[in-house]
Amino acid sequence: MEANYIVVRFGELTTKGKNRKLFTQKLLKNTKEILFEFPQLQYQLQYDRLYIYLNGANHLLVNEKLKTVFGIHSFSNAYKFEKDLDVVKDAIAKMINEDSKTTFKINTKRSDKTFPKKSQDINREIAGHVFHHVDRQLKVDVHHPEMLVTVEIRHDAIYVMTNIIKGAGGYPVGIGGKALLMLSGGIDSPVAGYLTLKRGVDIECVHFAAPPYTNEFAREKVFDLVDKLRHYTHGQITVHVVNFTKLQLAVYDHCDESYAMTVMRRMMYRIGEKLAIKNHCLALVNGESIGQVASQTLDSMNVINQVISIPVLRPVLCLDKLEIIDIAQKIDTYDISIRPHEDCCTIFTPKAPATKPKSYKAEAFEVTFDYETYVNECVENVETIVVDANYKNDEDIF
């Protein structure tokens, strides 16, 4: 059976007090943008629910899109019937018969107290009808049913909702401002971007390329990752590609090998901060996880952080690698991230990088060359590209 409409529940948004309207309006806007392929949909925003009227749209296709909307706690497919219990019983039996689940529960709510039958009596009557009209073995499970059917008897009609479908959770994207994601092409940074979006912070991305040491396949890999992330936002993400080759070679020419990674990261942060401020981003975001590599010890993070004044968000900071991989597989970025194309951080990896660097030593290496000119040149020559649904057809990207 095709559903008539979808009931969307907000979750964390219910705790937002006076800001509640701002959050729900943002969620409505984001939902409309993600469901733009279904122009026939109509929306009704109420205090604690969003009703989406399908008007013939396939509810299964809409369901898949709704699963990517941050700020949605859960949703249910719903059906509207005239106030004829026999019609409702037949419809529910058909729904359960079309499903493969073996346990179910009927939960009736009556806002129309003039309806002649009580909720418990309706539950028993519908369940009995289901047992007589479904051609497989079924059981009622009132505690943990595989299929929950909610029947709401209102003054205008009877409404039936099937299983509660889990939403993406979090807050509506954009409600928390915007940050600049340092996207390398590895496993961790796309996950960091996803988790940032989940907390309502919109993102732009910066990628550091080092041609000819990094190739067009590494570039394609990054844009494919962005294409996955854009499905969790308003359909497009801006990417800033920095040509890092000259500055990276200068770092390795003027620094002891053990400090090259530390100084290189400091240069990236300087460039990232300038791009963030220029593009109205309030923070940097990266995929650093404590102790994972030499540049991600607390000592290293402290020395690297000192060169900028804006915050650095590290959403995967305390996650194990396997936990990060689980999320990457869930959001479909893992297979892209493990493509064998190196980024600028891996092609020049020193054999014995400092794990407890000192800021005065990093500064001593930096004063031996005019790094500010290189940094400014990187910012001035940045390549900015918007990744949207048509990016694969954009010859300027590849």
What is the meaning of each model-derived region?
Residues 11, 163, 206-208, 242-245, ...:
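Generic beta-strand/beta-sheet core signal
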Residues 292, 340-348:
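Small/polar glycine-rich anion-binding or flexible loop at a beta-alpha turn
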Residues 178, 365-383:
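Short, cationic low-complexity segments
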Residues 186:
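Conserved G/P- and acidic residue-centered "switch" motifs that form tight phosphate/ATP-binding loops
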Residues 230-256, 260:
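S-adenosyl-L-methionine
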Residues 332-340:
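A short alpha-helix-loop-beta-strand transition element characteristic
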Residues 1-180, 190-238, 242, 306, ...:
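RNA-binding accessory domains that recognize and position tRNA/RNA substrates
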